[in-house]
């Protein structure tokens, strides 16, 4: 690779050299900035493939950046490589596979981190499944992924020696497997197999015969004993003769066996091929069979519904529409022509006779030909279509006399449903017309021959009169179809010829449907017209005008082609004529307006459905497919059956359409007919059944196309066959149900679509993405539903937001990530998405969500459904982004956030916030530059793991450090668990999102928080679901997460929860207390060099009072804990607190403890302030730890605010899992109690706990004592490990806030891990004493579960989180114990240990400290920057990274405590 890279740049000419240099710099830039978004990866992948001549340079630089990058970014680079490797062959750049094969073993060794290894393993599995690389290569890569570095190097050497060559050789042998299979399936001929088997059978018989002959031989050729018995010459000669005979027979036998042995392999090969072929066939057949089953179910359901509706339908003559009564005569007139056409007997006989009389096969063939656009008919139909487009009236011009008559007939039929016979007659008329229209003149001729033109003319005239009576003008005809089948229109236009083929059927369908309502009849007519000859067109125009459905002439055509349109929508529909017929049902379920989903059927069906005639609708629906697919008869039959009244009309009418329909798809038709037959209401169907049989011959011709399309369709299950299945599964209303719903003609495709989409029904999505297949449609559905969801969960960007809006947040998460991966999860309960969100994404879902993004990215290019839903996801994510450009929040929240603090925040620390914000939006990491993508891909990867990384790696630098640093792995590990728990618990942890939040929390969180605020106010019930509605209401969004878990401990719990994110809850109230000036930057407390600085920072930081909060960013810091949390965890915690920020300014006050309200306010307003602060010192760090440090005096205010108290109460509530007091308060007790637990459970937790514990000294500050004796500053090196957010700025422990509440604790821990897990823990005790043990502990406690899980899920998260937190706390407890004083303060005391006051204030301070510590962890992420930042805080006992920079923000890794459920 290196050589290749060198070669690429070392060109002879200077120009080439300069170009190579430009290429390399461009490569560096591109590889450095690639994110985990599909757009970024696919765009860079395409660029690489286009520059394939520089493949060696590209791969070399890819490897270079893989080595340099943090784990999340490494995963992004792996996604990029995957995209290139999988697409290079298709794009004629296969060289990339070999180039990457050289470096992949080493690359695999660089992505062993648990946060990304799962995603990479998934990539390898895809390569294996798709034979991208040989199995040996994949095995080697997997080994590299799981081995140590030394063995990796050996592996790489071995692999470079052997596998690459082997791979190049075996590429032809392995890859061919799939190609061979497809070749076998394509070339398999059953006749050859039969011949081989017969040959074998013959040879077997021959051998058997020879065997028998040998057994009857008198001489035992093989025995020498007989020779001894020879005595005389005669006997010897006799024996010799017999022996020779026997030996010749034996020779023949042996030769026969040899022959069989030689022929055996070919036979076995043939049998193997047959096995492969028939297996493939079986799979396809199973899909079709299942589709038919679902279709049958749909038909049965529809029959039931139709039966119910039939009882409610008025008599045709009593139909509300006047047209029906007028139609009565028309049908009679129609009857004559129908009989003339060859259906003189009863309707069903007529149909049959018509089938026979009219060139049925021809008609069917013509239908097929129509699809192929025969010359003669093609011109006619094209003209007709154009005419229709231009003028409905002109259509009649095509066949002037006929069209007029049919139109009239149709009008009459539609106006008078009870005139089924007449109607039937009319359809035949249109049928001939259609035939003429159709490419097959033969059909037209026979039809015309059978039809009495005079009768047709009279019928048409009567129809026209009826139309006039109806008050519909032919001109308006085009409109009717439009609403009903907008989708079909396009398609329809495409396939006018087929439509023409089915024109007579459509007429019959129309007639049969007429009985339902004039509108439905009109709709049917318009369809028929489209398909029928000009006469039919005229009818359709008249009908359409009558219907009032705005269907342009082109629409009529489109309807006739609707099969095609439907097919376009349901591209497979057309192919599956049967399904097409089924589709009417499906489309209803899908599109709700069959016209769109189905082809023509769709259009008519839509009209009918809109009319609200259940029977008519089905009839129309069937008819449409029939028309489009040549199913008219079938559809008609089916429709006829549904409407009892219609059946009479339909019977004759259907019989005729069935002729065509028959040709379309006999089996489906038969099935439909059977279903209809089964239903007493479908008496007309029985008549149609004969047609079905007739259609059988005709149907096959269309059947093939239908099969052709059906295959994909069934596969997708999106349309027709597939759709029913998907719809049922998704709980989407069945077509029948859909039909029932849109009973009025008002139902149009658009409205139906919107309606469907809104509810998250699968119908629209499936309609939208029929090609991808059921999966796609499903995900799409999900997307749609999620999108509905999303407004609430726009905060997907920040898992923490979930804490604030536990439910909503997950929704957004789901929307962006989970939706992709867990469409059903997110989608399932669209309507209840908010409540459901939390529970909706089960832990696994969350995890999947986290993982899936990677998958989606991996798959986006390979899976249509993935791709389809991914775009949707991306669109949703985009939407989320739109909502929260800064973070994924609803626009309003976003606006709040943006206006108040988000802008500042983002502007002030674009690096931190921008990335985070971006990140938060999509999976939360897409937006972020590199960290964002890393995080995002953390999400896709082992999302849980990646969370921690995301959190830590969220910051670009930290991310890098992350992979390299000792704790990155452990951190990740911790994070992984945490994320796992958190993710499962709720979206908040969705590892990717959560990570994103870790960094993005500030922006994301803020926006999310705002979202939450909005949501909190608007969906308290959801919160209540989790028993946190009240809290949520108060804290608004900031507490949303915590609220979910802390109804009673709003302040404390929130802080705990938020602490996890931001530990700003307490700060909120403190913020309120503190004057704005303090809050502004708060007097930077001198103290702070240690965790106490963290505390201080909470208090000392510019504490944001309510007002401050209102002012984005200014006093955020000040909010006791919240301020602190915001300070360093602005992004992470902002989700809860920040979102609330603006709206929560007052809420903050209300929270008193700075609960979520304060948090929110703090986050929102402080966000700006804090962002700058962070930038000044360490970005987020600065807010928590620095502010604490600088604003020691501030802490008291926050404490005073009462946040401490609130916090305490909240803490206890939250703490139930843990000691409530400590939890609520500082977790000092909790911490002690749980510290060991944390230690044991999660080293990082420990660290986090320790880090949290470290903050206790600041608690003193936080509590009443602004400058409580600051505990000795934690060792500068250890501040990170110690986790004193404020103090450990130099190497602040990763902020736990990004993590779930429980994660919060872990977060600080990872930084410790960075410093050394053991050391961190140990240090923490030291630091703890100097830092705020209580704070850390409390932070952990606070953040642990409650915050994590807003709501049951949140609670779960909290519970687990708390458990984790407890563990964390336990560690901190230890630390606190080490610190003694901080923890000594009891719940509050823990926080204030150092200070001494352990009460509420202490609690608050603790939270603040925790926040600080959290910040600390972040700085750990980018310790160096923090060190720079520290300079400003050199006064701190322990230099802390100044908040100036985002590094602390970025640097702190949030412990990945998997939330405990």
UniProtKB/Swiss-Prot annotation:
Keyword tags? Acetylation, Methylation, Phosphoprotein
Q: Which residues carry this modification: Phosphoserine?
A: 16, 356, 374, 473, 476, 479, 485, 564, 593, 614, 663, 665, 716, 730, 758, 762, 769, 817, 826, 900, 909, 928, 965, 976, 1068, 1099
Give the compositionally biased regions (Pro residues).
1267-1277, 1290-1299
Q: Which residues carry this modification: N-acetylalanine?
A: 2
Return the SUPFAM superfamilies for the record: ENTH/VHS domain
One Pfam family for this entry, by name?
Answer: CID
GO function term, MF aspect, one? RNA polymerase II complex binding
Which of the residues bear the PTM Asymmetric dimethylarginine? 1366, 1424, 1430
Q: Where is the composition biased (Polar residues)?
A: 397-416, 567-583, 742-752, 927-954, 1031-1055, 1174-1189
List residues, modification Phosphothreonine: 358, 482, 517, 598, 723, 732, 763
Q: Name one GO biological process term.
A: mRNA 3'-end processing
Kindly give the InterPro entries that the UniProt entry links to this protein.
Answer: CID_dom, ENTH_VHS, RPRD2_CID
Question: Which spans are transmembrane here?
Answer: none
List the biased-composition ranges (Gly residues).
Answer: 1151-1160, 1382-1391
Compositional bias per record (Basic and acidic residues), positions renumbered to this chain: 352-368, 379-394, 1417-1434
- Please list the residue ranges that the record marks as compositionally biased, kind Acidic residues: 369-378
- The CID domain extends over 19-149
Q: Which domain of life is it from?
A: Eukaryota
- Which residues does the annotated region (Disordered) include? 311-438, 469-504, 547-623, 696-849, 900-997, 1016-1102, 1132-1312, 1340-1461
Q: Which GO terms describe its cellular component?
A: nucleoplasm; transcription preinitiation complex
Q: How does it assemble?
A: Associates with the RNA polymerase II complex.
Protein's name according to its UniProt entry? Regulation of nuclear pre-mRNA domain-containing protein 2
Species of provenance: Homo sapiens
Native organism taxonomy: Eukaryota, Metazoa, Chordata, Craniata, Vertebrata
UniProt gene name: RPRD2
